[in-house]
């Protein structure tokens, strides 16, 4: 980053922020699709049943914890790789 001028740093930051937003939207979309498919089975009412609500809460918590754990492992692997390369 130090080798970039101010304009290049701003452009780099913009690209990083766009990628982060895209990744967040993909995560959210996957969460909604998976939990809805797994938990919502009754389409006779426009409201969720208490069983469906509970299922969605558990599903989303589990999904987010899993995503967080994967992110942590990725950071650990990246740090180990950087350390082994002498960075």
UniProtKB/Swiss-Prot annotation:
Entry keyword annotation includes Metal-binding: yes
Motif Twin CX3C motif positions after renumbering to this chain: 35-59
Localization of this protein: Mitochondrion inner membrane
InterPro entries: Mito_inner_translocase_sub, Tim10-like, Tim10-like_dom_sf
Keyword Metal-binding attached: yes
Function: Mitochondrial intermembrane chaperone that participates in the import and insertion of multi-pass transmembrane proteins into the mitochondrial inner membrane. Also required for the transfer of beta-barrel precursors from the TOM complex to the sorting and assembly machinery (SAM complex) of the outer membrane. Acts as a chaperone-like protein that protects the hydrophobic precursors from aggregation and guide them through the mitochondrial intermembrane space.
Name of this protein: Mitochondrial import inner membrane translocase subunit TIM9
Protein encoded by which gene: TIM9
